[in-house]
Curated annotation (Swiss-Prot):
GO biological process: proteolysis
GO cellular component, one term: extracellular region
Active-site residues, record numbering mapped to chain: D227, H274, S452
An example molecular function term from Gene Ontology annotations: serine-type endopeptidase activity
Source species: Bacillus subtilis (strain 168)
Name this protein carries in UniProt: Bacillopeptidase F
Localisation per UniProt entry: Secreted
Length: 1433
């Protein structure tokens, strides 16, 4: 990755990787050059002495006065020969197996020591003298590799290389562990798992528990690790440490059980966790049976610490390897009898050829120590792919392990073969993804990934084999492990064994069974009835010229409707016999592939050849016989200007682009004439290429000089893509590097390479271009090639001249051109076995029902082979779309049982139907209909009528229906014959939102060197929202200034947030192609048609489609507050973004699910007398709110940004049921809860019956009464007091005040209509006052005499009087009851007369006056004067 800002380092991800992750030193242990036998001399020239010195070592002396370097000696011991001699001698003496092993190992150590002592003595003597002078120190002699490590001055180094016994001197390079991408975190470490579920998935997957059940858990064996150390007292490891002393459990015996090459600590420890995790996978489990993390829990472990945080130096690793070969006591004496059975090596160097440790590995093998090496992991500098496997794992003598995941798929970080020795690598695979094991702190941690995690599984299974048979040799163990592995294949590696999985997944049970019970083999063919009636067809461009002494690679493309089973090439030289060779398929498959065969060692004057193509049905098609003119080898005087077809020039290799013709790019014109040979005449060369262009064979003159001269134009990525000229000496297999080319030439240049050193030899010369995974340029062009005996004065020195230095800063690890090796075509394996007539081949899984072990038949032939523990079993053959079949087999040790299967195709059924919108009933166009249980069935798509149809094999299925803008739906179906199913999808109604975490301003931009990497931002939906639809993304890119020239292509992906520690988890959508705007504006990527539903948290991801500088630069907000939501995707791994990068400028456009609106006003069951009403409520912001009155839409409005809405509508008379829905372009929500509003414009009917208007009273209270009538009556109030209403009447008792009282009766209904009645009543609580009442004195009256009765009082009173007779008068009661009126003679003056009659006789009769007013007040008063009637005085 690089940034726009030139003076800044690339992101800390790069530096993190360099410091602590997966770095492989590019110049570690450069191999010695191959020198032609004809030019070897006993005397050393100045040039040959300088060639002994590593260029990187020379550079280190420019920085330091002294440095540590390694001295490698020419003399090599032959430990294998010594071991064989020791075994032979032991057998003659009839020694026991244990004594034989001891003598064998001792002989190995002795042979190494003797060779080292003899060859090193003079140099050691010199170094010790320099030590005395202060010019050298830290001298350490090794025998496991014949070498010395010393810390000394440049002068000492230059003297050392002059010793003839010294082969070369090298820097003390650092090697790296293949660390997990999930480094140890004490806080996340896990506690013990109970024994009931204590076997880890990875241990179980390789059938280790089944091996334990047979009694093989590694007991009696010892495994070693060269790593970061081990926490010896970890509960899963403590009692398994060979130094553990049960009598003194806390004080182990560390001598010869532990060695610290880094810090010299006496007791085992692990400061980096890696070694503890690795050892746990080999042997770990707790005494109580919990935490069964190890494959060989009965084995013992020993360990060497050779790695620190910065890696392990060559000197420390040599010391470790020597100790493993024969652990040393306190005095430094080796003890081969204490050597382990297996050594695990989860470390390595870079890819390619580096043989520094090969002698060490050979020594281990000779001593019967099984050398397991992890294949290595991808990193920023090693992208993986073919040939990437690290050293020493890529040695032929190393047993390399690749990594798989829980699904037995190759881990994307696992490096691949072939090896530089053209061997399949790795040998085997084992689980290496999300591995749980022991870590320091006496706890456990899962989530560790890497081939480091895979290797210990294989080391432990090797220990199980040693327990089963301690006499097994390393070769035998390798054969058992590979032959019992479960073959694994995929689309990249369709055949087994292959350069991804090797021979497959290691299987502990089968491996042990092979030793104890032996293996049987079932083989046969899986087929389906049918005939292959079409013969194969082919294409071949004939060759007309070849050159004597060379070879002729020929290619042919063959095609067949069923299967091409073999392609053979027959040739003859002159009149000789025909020779037949089998061509290798180098690309394609059994239906159509390209095949290559190479005719070796061409002689004579004429070559004839023909092809034979065989297909599955037995057809054989033969080509014509092609005649080739054989020309003598070219030599001095040869010229080739490429204007005519260049005979004898052969192009081949990986991603080969070499072609002959007229260039339209690069130099655009030839150096002379019109035509050239170039790497793609119309564009850039391929990435990850290793392409060869070989000249005709050359015969170097026996004397004189020979120079290769040619015109060259090249534009190659600085420091990463190189052009080479290689020379293959006569009789050699390894090509020598003669010229190196890098960078860009400004025009055609003259190049010259001196071939004079190859006098008298038949040699070959190759032009080779090698590229990494990114940044391809215009390439290399060759013209006007000449072989001359005279120099043109432009000789290119090997690895020196011809290299054009790059400008600018290095952004990724440069390629070391010294390690380059030309490509060799790798054949694609395919079987050619006898076939059955009248059948067609079928790829099927063949399984052992009782154990589950399985393999696959070859797609081109139907043939399969399955090795298994001997016994009686049931084999099952099953293939997609076919009825499975079984048959009983009896597998016998070392015998082959035939079992053929002919399968019958299953019947198919048809599912059809219509998908509609659940809300509207309209058809849904573009809905996808999936068969969940059968991903091979292509999803059906609905047409514009919503109709779909799909075909699948009969059976029970779950059908999922999904469409953009809708919620998906599922249903179950029993598919048999034709089935029809209708589906209604609920629309997803959303409103737009934008999620952003940057501040909108871009301060920088980034671009990855390699395509396929990316950046992501974690998005979180708004509060209260748990679901949404992703409708688009906003991406901000830099302008055309960066990168230059740049590009616009990129991809968009979407991940959920279920990854470990918050990382992106599962990809839920994408990749989608997009085009970047490079003008400072945001680039909007429309995803609305994709139907991407997201949960609360999700990731929007930018994936770079093109390598830098042909990609856009994603902008970075470096000044805004860091959101902590930034992640980067590098080499298939997610990791948190570099905080220094700030916030990645990626935003998400989402539709939040539109909520069903809520009407807040008017309230339910409300009444109004208004014709219209304002409906208010809440809805999702920006949605259109539709208000309905009954079934009819009454109004429409848009919800505001805060979600509120309001709209006026017209009401109907009577009851109105109001609802609201919200809509977007995608559809409409459900209706809100109904609100009932009644429009009532009629007033209540009301009477006021009591009191009558104008009434008078003297009462303090009054009951007001009347009648009322209304359907929606709310209340009746009298003077504001709520009246009692019943049966159409109302009443209310009120208080009155003295004086005039107005009584108001109001009848109100629920709609607010009112009827009012009023009345007035006069109230007087005061009684009239009587004054001046006469007679004031007693009066004597006789019959006929009158008395005047008078008084004063208020006006308009009703005045009366009565004469109250004494009670003694019998008739008094009658008289007393009579009231006689008084007349108001003047306002307020009342008078009256009473005349005595003769009939009344009374003494003391009283006169009482009574006044009454209109209010009902009454006053009585008795006059002071009494009446004596008809009495005597």
């Amino acid at each position: 990755m690089r940034k726009k800002t030139k003076n800044r380092l690339i992101s800390s991800v790069l530096s993190t990787v360099v410091i602590s992750s997966l770095l492989f030193p590019g110049a570690a242990g450069a191999s010695s050059k191959v020198t032609s036998p004809s030019v070897k001399k006993e005397l050393q020239s100045a040039e040959s002495i300088q060639n002994k010195i590593s260029s990187s070592l020379k550079k280190s002396f420019k920085k330091k006065e002294k440095t540590t370097f390694l001295i490698k000696f020419k003399d090599l011991a032959n430990p294998e020969k010594a071991a064989k001699a020791a075994v032979k001698k032991a057998k003659s003496k009839k020694l026991s197996a244990a004594k034989t092993e001891y003598q064998k190992r001792s002989a190995v150590v002795s042979s190494l020591k003797v060779t080292a002592d003899e060859s090193q003595q003079d140099v050691l003597k010199y170094l010790n003298t320099q030590k005395d002078k202060g010019n050298a120190d830290q001298i350490h002699s090794y025998y496991v590799v014949n070498g010395i490590a010393v810390h000394a001055s440049k002068e000492v180094m230059e003297k050392v290389v002059q010793f003839p016994e010294v082969e070369k001197v090298l820097p003390n390079e650092k090697r790296q562990l293949f660390k997990s991408s999930s480094p140890f975190n004490m806080k996340k470490a896990q506690k013990a798992i109970k024994a009931t579920d204590g076997v880890e998935w990875n241990v179980d997957q390789i059938d280790a528990p089944k091996a334990w059940a047979l009694g093989y858990d590694g007991t009696g064996t010892v495994v070693a690790s060269i790593d970061t150390g081990v926490e010896w007292n970890h509960p899963a490891l403590k009692e398994k440490y060979r130094g553990y002393n049960p009598e003194n459990p806390n004080e182990p015996e560390n001598e010869m059980n532990w060695y610290d090459a880094v810090a010299g600590e006496a007791s085992p420890y692990d400061d980096l966790a890696h070694g503890t995790h690795v050892t746990g996978t080999m042997v770990g489990s707790e005494p109580d049976g919990t935490n069964q993390i190890g494959v060989a829990p009965g084995a013992k472990w020993i360990a060497v610490k050779a790695f620190s945080e910065d890696g392990g130096t060559d000197a420390d690793i040599l010391e470790a390897g020597e100790w493993v070969l024969a652990p040393k006591d306190a005095e430094g004496n080796p003890h081969p009898e204490m050597a382990p059975d297996v050594v695990n090596n989860s470390w390595g160097g870079g890819s390619g050829l580096d043989e520094w440790y090969r002698d060490m590995v050979n020594a281990w093998r000779a001593a019967d120590i099984f050398p397991e090496f992890s294949a290595g992991n991808t990193d920023l500098f090693i992208p993986g792919g073919p040939g990437s496997i690290a050293n020493p794992a890529n040695y032929p003598e190393s047993f390399a392990t690749g990594a798989t995941d829980i699904n037995k798929k190759l881990a994307d970080f696992s490096l691949q073969g072939p090896s530089p020795y053209d061997e399949i690598k790795p040998e085997i695979s084992a689980p290496g993804v999300n591995i749980r094991s022991s870590v320091p702190g006496q706890t456990y941690e899962d989530g560790w990934d890497g081939t480091s995690m895979a290797g210990p599984h294989v080391s432990a299974v090797a220990a199980l084999l040693k327990q089963a048979n301690a006499s097994l040799s390393v070769d035998e163990m390798e054969d058992i492990l590979t032959s019992t592995a479960e073959p694994l294949t995929d689309s990249t590696f369709p055949d087994s064994p292959n350069n991804g999985y090797g021979h497959g997944l290691v299987n502990a049970f089968d491996a042990v069974s092979a030793v104890t019970d032996g293996l049987g083999k079932a083989e046969g063919q899986v087929s389906v009835e049918g005939d292959d009636q079409e013969p194969p067809v082919y294409q071949h461009e004939k060759v007309t010229e070849a050159y004597e002494g060379g070879s002729l690679p020929l290619t042919l493309t063959a095609e067949d409707n069923v299967s091409v089973t073999s392609v053979k090439l027959s040739y003859k030289l002159d009149q000789g016999e025909w020779t037949e060779i089998t061509a290798k398929r180098i690309s394609g498959d059994h239906l159509k592939g390209t095949y290559q065969a190479e005719i070796p060692d061409i002689k004579g004057t004429k070559l004839s050849y023909k092809w034979m193509i065989h297909d599955f049905g037995g057809h054989v098609v033969s080509s014509d016989v092609y005649d080739v003119t054989v020309k003598p080898s070219i030599t001095a005087g040869y010229k080739q200007d490429f204007e005519t077809a260049p005979g004898g020039w052969v192009a081949s290799g990986t991603n080969n682009n070499w072609e002959w013709g007229v260039p339209s790019t690069g130099p655009n014109t030839a150096a002379s004439g019109e035509k050239v040979y170039g790497t793609n005449l119309t564009g850039n060369y391929a990435n990850s290429a290793n392409m060869n262009l070989v000249m005709p064979p050359i015969k170097a003159p026996d004397s004189g000089s020979l120079f290769l001269q040619f015109k060259s134009w090249h534009n190659l990525e600085d420091d990463f893509d190189y052009g080479y000229v290689f020379v293959l000496p006569e009789g050699e297999k390894n090509w020598e590097q003669a010229g190196v080319y890098n960078g860009k030439t400004s025009s055609w240049t003259d190049e010259e390479i001196d071939l004079s050193a190859y006098k008298g030899q038949n040699i070959q010369v190759m032009f080779n271009l090698q590229s990494d995974e990114s940044i391809a340029k215009e390439g290399w062009y060759i013209d006007d090639v000449v072989l001359s005996d005279k120099s043109a004065g432009k000789t290119v020195k090997k690895n020196k001249l011809g290299v054009e230095k790059p400008s600018g800063k290095q952004k990724k690890k440069p390629v070391n051109p010294k390690k380059a090796k030309p490509s060799a075509n790798t054949a694609v394996k395919h079987q050619n076995k006898a076939i059955q007539p009248q059948v067609l081949p079928l790829k099927a899984q063949v399984s052992v029902v009782e154990t589950g072990k399985s393999t696959y038949s070859d797609q081109s032939t139907g043939q399969y082979t399955l090795k298994h523990k001997a016994g009686d079993y049931t084999l099952m053959a099953e293939a997609y779309g076919y009825q499975s079949k079984t048959q009983k087999v009896s597998l016998k040790t070392d015998q082959t049982t035939q079992a053929n299967f002919t399968l019958e195709e299953m019947k198919k059924g048809t599912l059809k139907g219509t998908v509609i919108n659940k809300t509207t009933g309209e058809p849904v166009t573009g809905a996808s209909v999936y068969v969940v249980e059968d991903a091979a069935v292509e999803p059906a798509m609905t047409n514009d009528k919503g109709e779909y149809m799909l075909e699948a094999y009969e059976g029970a299925y779950t059908i999922k229906v999904a469409a953009p803008g809708y919620y998906s739906d599922e249903f179950s179906v029993e598919l048999k014959g034709d089935v029809t199913k209708e589906t209604a999808l609920k629309p997803f109604v959303g409103y737009p939102g934008e999620i952003a975490y940057d501040d909108g301003t871009a301060e920088n931009a980034n671009s990855y060197f390699a395509a396929g990497n990316g950046w992501a931002v974690k998005m979180t939906l708004a509060d209260g929202k748990d679901k949404g639809m992703l409708t688009g993304g906003l991406f901000r890119f830099w302008d055309t200034e960066f990168p230059d020239p740049g590009g616009t292509e990129f991809k968009v992906e979407v991940y959920d947030a279920t990854g470990k520690d918050g990382a992106p988890g599962k990809k839920i959508a994408g990749p989608f192609n997009a085009e970047a705007l490079r003008n400072g504006e945001w680039t909007k990527v429309d995803l609305s048609s994709k139907g991407i539903m997201v949960d609360k948290d999700f990731y929007l991801v930018y994936i770079q489609s093109k390598p830098d500088p042909y990609s856009p630069g994603l902008a970075m907000d470096e000044t805004g507050q860091n959101s902590g939501r930034n992640w980067q995707y590098i080499d298939g791994k997610w990791q948190p973004g570099d905080k220094a990068d700030g916030n990645y400028m990626i935003r998400a456009l989402v539709d939040y699910e539109a909520a069903v609106p809520e009407i807040t006003s008017p309230t339910d069951k409300s009444y109004t007398n208004k014709d219209s009403v304002t409906v208010k409520g809440n809805a999702s912001p920006g949605t259109t709110v539709h208000i309905y009155n009954g079934e009819k839409e009454a109004g429409e409005t848009k919800a505001a940004a805060d979600g509120t809405f309001h709209a006026g509508i017209i009401l109907n008379k009577g009851e109105n049921e109001l609802t609201a829905t919200a809509s977007t372009d995608n559809g409409t929500t459900d209706a809100s809860s109904p609100i009932t509003v009644t429009l009532d414009q009629e007033k209540p009917e009301l009477t006021l019956d009591n009191p009558k208007d104008g009434g008078k009273t003297n009462k303090e209270t009054l009951t007001v009464k009347g009648a009322v009538s209304d359907d929606n009556l709310k209340d009746v109030k009298v003077n504001g007091k709520k009246a009692t209403v019943a049966d159409g009447s109302y009443s209310a008792r009120i208080l009155l005040e003295n004086g005039r009282n107005e009584i108001k009766v109001i009848a109100t209904d629920l709609a607010g209509n009112k009827t009012t009645k009023k009345t007035v009543i006069d109230v007087n609580f005061d009684k009239p006052v009587i004054s001046g009442l006469i007679p004031g004195e007693d009066k004597n009256l006789k019959a006929g005499e009158s008395v005047k009765i008078a008084f004063s009082s208020a006006e308009d009173l009703d005045a009366t009087f009565t004469i109250r007779m004494p009670l003694t008068n019998a008739r008094a009661s009658v008289q007393n009851a009579t009231e006689l009126p008084l007349r108001e003679i003047s306002p307020g003056r009342y008078e009256g007369y009473w005349t005595a009659t003769s009939s009344i006789k009374a003494k003391g009769a009283k006169v009482e006056v009574i006044v009454r007013d209109d209010y009902g007040n009454e006053t009585r008063k008795t006059a002071n004067g009494k009446l004596n009637m008809n009495t005597e005085n």
